């Protein structure tokens, strides 16, 4: 990292990209647990439906990202498509995702492949999910089956996206109708936590058996728990089961994904809502681009020299100028972390596309808008701006 007359120059080889998740953009993920929940008359307000139709339009998505100047694309492959029934692996779906890997490489995009991003096959959920006997072994079996997809041309593999949030979801299911807290997160389900860590370790070994050259990690939802005066011990106790235990599990990994959006303030009585005068995004979260700097430093303090990759960071807003402002602030935090010697290897924005945000299409995180009726893609000014940074590797100096 160095400062030039033009601005802050990021290291050569820095990953500049955007991220997506299969269920949120592909459409018609009919064999997944989430599709079943969306159509079971529960609390999910809006089903995913066709999503952004990226299952058929992935080439267009990659064309745009490459044309905009990005060098990296993180996408997930869908377990429910690859193994729609126990032990039945679809050669057609495996070939589909291999075409995506090849398509990224042909366009000059380095593919980062996520093996699990929240959704599981319906049959896996119905047998008890992550806490059922043999769950980690079943995940390992699926990972082994992905060999034709990831064996060549894939440098980075993420085993599980935000396992801490999956454990929180497990606890919420246990609570049933009990209201969630107004700030912070419920205590994760420990059995789910333990199962996910075991699944990650088995998956890591399986990927390494496919190719020792693949760099393997997982990505954590960093909530940025900020201790208010006198609440340092309470904050550490609150953070550990919700975040730190998952970061600790990455100490022997090749890299760890840092995913950050906002902060949560902690008092001796627990988490408190954002300040009344805080700007809020379309998700209701506090606008707080500084969160990424805290997340990087907190993660580095736990994992030491394990490389950090920002695998998600962004903002849900209808005002694209705020997206540019937010991302500028976040990248300033990345540059400061690099200056301080942290091993930050990349920044992948969430999200490449406006997409399905787990019950609603209203929170627009995308650099590229998607027309709901025609699926027409339109890059926003933020996409052109961030792609330009990817081309130059320089974040311009702030102007007064």
Model features per residue range: what roles?
Residues 1-62, 66-71, 80-400:
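Non-catalytic scaffold segments within catalytic domains of secreted glycoside hydrolases
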